[in-house]
């Protein structure tokens, strides 16, 4: 028979995800007794006891499921928090706040549209209301197609900016719907414009949400993260529906009160959206983040971590960078003669060709068929460094000398400066790339905007492929 010490000695342990482990020891009757059941927090599943047993008692590894752990399994991805990115929880909390505010604003807007269509008005024409509705919907459908064609490939590059833009545009659309009944003669045009904006919101918001889900999913669990996000949104919308049922009767007869509530809810919506987007920490480089990281590297010799760079990334002005950088342009945009091609290729050992227009501060890059992600990063870095030569701020020695040459001799051929910066990058870029990887950036992929053009040209035998 085992003595008391051996009975208390743990036979084995178990844990759920990153939750605290609990041990199992032998009970006096020879059964297994699991301890620590009551200490488990909401970040791990609560143990469930078998019928007739108490939590932590012998005979079963699980205690009764608590309410919080039940909500966790319903609303959060399996394996949370290890199965998602570190910014998942703050983003989802602020996203839920903005969804709640948007739900209430949407109720006010829907009420206004229904009033404008004649709901509750005996003199209203069913055919007129139907025609208005059809015009509104068809306008929105066209807008959805046009935006997907026009900006679809660019939504990944600036997902945070487009996400914020979409939600602000949604507020504008709801404002138009609330104002529409006040001007009956323009009602159809107003609600059609509003629905056009909402369809743009649907495309931009849905696409960027998918991009953010890819970022959040850390165990190839995109479907689970997306499904739980949908569940969270449904719960928030249900709460918004219940509050709307109480709010609408109070404001329905007072347009000014309705408009005042809308303004307050819109302010909350925009603030929560800003906080949600600002909470995101994306580890891939787009042009804005690359420029921030590169500037810091050139000035201080160290690479910003993703958390710091994301906090500094502009959210309102990210669509209009000071430098016009075009990657993957057709080769015929860069050269128009054999001499220009030879001039551009000479001394070019990387699988890209770069042309810099100093007067327009415009950089165009033609990529080789063999160009990989690191080549694109180097080309973008090259272009941003050329742009930095025309701006203020500290630079390393060789680049500071090149800037002095640019300022002293504005007529100096740009292709000469491109070649000289190539030589600087041969030393600088490997250090920069190593620093990016050490800081936590994912350099095997990027979110730089790159067109599909690729080219071949007479190559130096020293050409590199990254």
Swiss-Prot record:
Superkingdom: Eukaryota
Family: Belongs to the RUS1 family.
Name of this chain's protein: RUS family member 1
N-acetylalanine PTM positions: 2
Alphabetically ordered keywords of this record: Acetylation, Membrane, Transmembrane, Transmembrane helix
Location in the cell: Membrane
Primary location group: membrane
Organism: Mus musculus (Mouse)
GO cellular component terms, semicolon-separated: membrane
Membrane topology: Single-pass membrane protein
Membrane-spanning parts: 245-265
This protein's encoding gene: Rusf1
């Amino acid at each position: 028979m085992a003595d008391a010490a051996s009975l208390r000695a743990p036979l084995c342990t178990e844990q759920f995800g990153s939750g605290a482990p609990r041990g199992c020891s032998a009970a006096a009757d020879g059964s297994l007794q699991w301890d620590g059941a009551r200490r488990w927090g909401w970040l791990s599943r609560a143990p469930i006891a078998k019928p007739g047993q108490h939590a932590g008692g012998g005979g079963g590894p699980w205690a009764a499921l608590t309410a919080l752990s039940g909500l966790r399994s319903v609303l959060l991805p399996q394996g949370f928090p290890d199965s998602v990115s570190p910014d998942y929880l703050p983003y989802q909390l602020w996203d839920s706040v903005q969804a709640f505010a948007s739900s209430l604003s949407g109720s006010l807007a829907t009420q206004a549209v229904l009033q404008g269509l004649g709901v509750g008005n005996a003199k209203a024409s069913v055919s007129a209301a139907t025609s208005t509705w059809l015009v509104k919907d068809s306008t929105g459908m066209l807008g959805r197609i046009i935006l997907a064609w026009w900006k679809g490939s660019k939504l990944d590059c600036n997902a945070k900016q487009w996400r914020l833009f979409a939600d602000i545009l949604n507020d504008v659309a709801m404002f138009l719907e609330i104002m529409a009944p006040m001007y009956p003669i323009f009602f159809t045009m107003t609600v059609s414009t509003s629905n056009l904006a909402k369809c743009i919101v649907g495309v931009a918001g849905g696409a960027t949400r998918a991009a953010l889900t890819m970022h959040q999913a850390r165990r190839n669990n995109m479907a689970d993260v997306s499904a739980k996000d949908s569940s969270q949104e449904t719960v928030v919308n249900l709460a918004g529906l219940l509050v709307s049922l109480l709010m609408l009767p109070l404001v329905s007869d007072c347009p000014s009160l309705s408009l005042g509530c809308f303004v307050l809810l819109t302010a909350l919506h925009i603030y929560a959206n800003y906080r949600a987007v600002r909470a995101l920490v994306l580890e891939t480089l787009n042009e804005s983040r690359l420029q921030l990281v590169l500037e810091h590297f050139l000035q201080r010799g160290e690479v910003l971590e993703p958390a710091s760079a994301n906090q500094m990334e502009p959210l309102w002005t990210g669509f209009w960078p000071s430098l016009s950088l075009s990657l993957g342009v057709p080769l015929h945009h860069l050269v128009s003669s054999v001499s220009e091609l030879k001039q551009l290729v000479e001394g070019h050992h990387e699988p890209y060709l770069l042309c810099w227009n100093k007067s327009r501060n415009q950089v165009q890059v033609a990529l080789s068929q063999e160009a990989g992600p690191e080549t694109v990063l180097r080309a973008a870095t090259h272009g941003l460094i050329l742009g930095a030569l025309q701006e203020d701020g500290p630079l390393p020695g060789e680049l500071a000398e090149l800037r002095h040459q640019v300022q002293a001799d504005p007529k100096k051929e740009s292709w000469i400066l491109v070649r000289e910066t190539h030589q600087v990058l041969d030393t600088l870029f490997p250090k920069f790339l190593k620093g990016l990887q050490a800081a936590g950036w994912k350099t095997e992929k990027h979110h730089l905007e790159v067109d599909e053009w690729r080219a071949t040209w007479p190559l130096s035998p020293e050409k590199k492929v990254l």
